[in-house]
Amino acid sequence: MKKGCKYGTHRVIEPAGVLPQPAKKISNDMEIFSNEILIDVIALNIDSASFTQIEEEAGHDVEKVKAKIKEIVAERGKMQNPVTGSGGMLIGTVEKIGDDLVGKTDLKVGDKIATLVSLSLTPLRIDEIINIKPEIDRVEIKGKAILFESGIYAVLPKDMPENLALAALDVAGAPAQVAKLVKPCQSVAILGSAGKSGMLCAYEAVKRVGPTGKVIGVVRNDKEKALLQRVSDKVKIVIADATKPMDVLHAVLEANDAKEVDVAINCVNVPNTEMSTILPVKEFGIAYFFSMATGFSKAALGAEGVGKDITMIVGNGYTVDHAAITLEELRESAVLREIFNEIYL
């Protein structure tokens, strides 16, 4: 076996000299290098922003969605939406471990894992799309994938169904970042708080701010409000369109005694919500953009344009122990687990 670069640069076809994630095309030849792991793929969880874009482009026609996904993988060697630039993650079974990783990894052949690196950099071959579940952004396939030496993963827990674990691990970075960023007594606004990542963030934020803090959940409609109310009765819920910054600002200020918030978290899966996240944040506060629909230039120039001196964290989906933190939420909260079971199983 030949040895490749631990970051996967040996798989890059075009353009030369870049890493796999920004590459336009990578090799999805499934003959592994000595420091790679071959995965027999069970399902892809497409990033929410990516799936939404593909679905809208396809006119919500499932067969056209299938064709678009196959086209992307055939052209790029990976599942990276050319419009959003994002990917998702996968679950599968370890089929083969490269010679250089035997004894160095805790994985063994037959382990079921979820990859915690983006599909936007993961070599992928799709042999067949078995089923698509648009309501949960899931694509069940027959296919193979490669995990690089530097790739992170989680062995699927035995105390919950694999689809439940997959749903949570798909957005593991969001609640784990909340655990790091949010402090006692703070005020926090969460946009898209009734979505998968949003509900987990809301639950974690309530824990972190404690009894003297405040968590404000921004949702689109009464249906989402009812769902978020089930997650926690300690979340102050407001209805506003996240693409309308002034509406969001006024709603958040009204819910927070006319004060700006310490932290705003964006979990929305559509574009043009940057300023709705930035405007409600107080001077020297934090805006965390988990959403892959975030535009860096819109956020940076937008904050500058309104004179906001705030810390902005854009799209950082990984933090240490993020998988453990997120799965623990489902163990702690019977209500969260019940909701996830209803939606994602």
UniProtKB/Swiss-Prot annotation:
Keywords: NAD, NADP, Oxidoreductase. Its EC number is 1.4.1.11. Pathway: Amino-acid degradation; L-lysine degradation via acetate pathway. The keyword Transmembrane does not apply. It catalyses: (3S,5S)-3,5-diaminohexanoate + NAD(+) + H2O = (5S)-5-amino-3-oxohexanoate + NH4(+) + NADH + H(+). InterPro entries: NAD(P)-bd_dom_sf (IPR036291). One of its GO terms (biological process) is L-lysine catabolic process to acetate. One of its GO terms (molecular function) is L-erythro-3,5-diaminohexanoate dehydrogenase activity. Involved in the anaerobic fermentation of lysine. Catalyzes the oxidative deamination of L-erythro-3,5-diaminohexanoate (3,5-DAH) to 3-keto-5-aminohexanoate (KAH). It can use NAD or NADP. Homodimer. Belongs to the KDD family. This is L-erythro-3,5-diaminohexanoate dehydrogenase. It comes from Fusobacterium nucleatum subsp. nucleatum (strain ATCC 25586 / DSM 15643 / BCRC 10681 / CIP 101130 / JCM 8532 / KCTC 2640 / LMG 13131 / VPI 4355). The lineage of its organism: Bacteria, Fusobacteriati, Fusobacteriota, Fusobacteriia, Fusobacteriales.
